[in-house]
């Protein structure tokens, strides 16, 4: 895959907590200049991004339950509905890590299913923070995600330690057995990293350093 083709599978992201409106506007100009198909911004900036990109074929995505996943299901559902009203076209939700670590997989699955229902057919990806999980947890939560009807399992936010590895992407792809796609995010810093992750089975990549990757440079971003 050529570097420029990566714009079709990279979700270009600006979720830094100190990003302001001017930063978002510069980011959106880069999105248009490079031809990215999907982007992610914080919920506050979704209306601005949707309006700014009105004449361009770009999906604006939003994180839900970001970045720790501990919000109640009701809060995640309402966050999803508001984001959609504001024009969001993709949802990346964080799994309830506390419930997962407590072994309450029924709650984990219900939490995801309710957000999937609220998304009403839009692409829904579930972030599991692979660096914080053991292998049994990775398997169990991915099975929950499949049963809940989400479209993707996503490796990480990049904010909570660790990120995508070839081994984790390969494992999630094997667990998914074609029933769910894998989005890799966190720690993908070079074009070579991206190719290795794709070869392992990822069909989508999340990165705030996408332009550096496409240029053949090394991204300095952790997410």
From Swiss-Prot:
One of its GO terms (molecular function) is deoxyribose-phosphate aldolase activity. SUPFAM superfamilies: Aldolase. It is an enzyme of class 4 (lyase). Pathway: Carbohydrate degradation; 2-deoxy-D-ribose 1-phosphate degradation; D-glyceraldehyde 3-phosphate and acetaldehyde from 2-deoxy-alpha-D-ribose 1-phosphate: step 2/2. Keywords: Cytoplasm, Lyase, Schiff base. SMART domains: DeoC (SM01133). GO terms for biological process: 2-deoxyribose 1-phosphate catabolic process; carbohydrate catabolic process; deoxyribonucleotide catabolic process. One of its GO terms (cellular component) is cytoplasm. It catalyses: 2-deoxy-D-ribose 5-phosphate = D-glyceraldehyde 3-phosphate + acetaldehyde. It is found in: Cytoplasm. Its EC number is 4.1.2.4. The active site is at residues 92, 154, 183. Catalyzes a reversible aldol reaction between acetaldehyde and D-glyceraldehyde 3-phosphate to generate 2-deoxy-D-ribose 5-phosphate. Belongs to the DeoC/FbaB aldolase family. DeoC type 1 subfamily. This is Deoxyribose-phosphate aldolase 2.
């Amino acid at each position: 895959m050529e570097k420029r083709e990566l714009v079709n599978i990279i979700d270009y992201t600006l979720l830094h907590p100190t990003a302001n409106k001017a930063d978002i506007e510069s980011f959106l100009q880069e999105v248009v200049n490079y031809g990215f198909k999907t982007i992610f911004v914080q919920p506050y900036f979704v209306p601005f991004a949707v309006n700014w990109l009105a004449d361009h074929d770009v999906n604006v995505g939003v994180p839900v339950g970001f970045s720790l996943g501990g919000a109640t299901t009701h809060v995640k559902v309402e966050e999803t509905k508001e984001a959609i009203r504001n024009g969001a076209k993709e949802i990346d939700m964080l799994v309830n890590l506390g419930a997962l670590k407590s072994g309450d997989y029924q709650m984990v699955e219900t939490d995801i299913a309710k957000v999937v229902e609220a998304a009403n057919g839009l692409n829904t990806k579930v972030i599991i923070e692979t660096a914080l999980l053991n292998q049994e947890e990775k398997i169990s939560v991915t099975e929950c995600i499949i049963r809940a009807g989400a479209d993707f399992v996503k490796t990480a936010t990049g904010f909570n330690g660790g990120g995508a590895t070839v081994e984790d992407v390969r494992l999630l792809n094997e667990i998914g057995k074609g029933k769910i796609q894998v989005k890799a995010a966190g720690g993908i810093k070079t074009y070579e990293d991206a190719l290795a992750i794709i070869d392992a089975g990822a069909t989508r990549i999340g990165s705030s350093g996408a332009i550096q990757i496409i240029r053949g440079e090394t991204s300095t971003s952790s997410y």
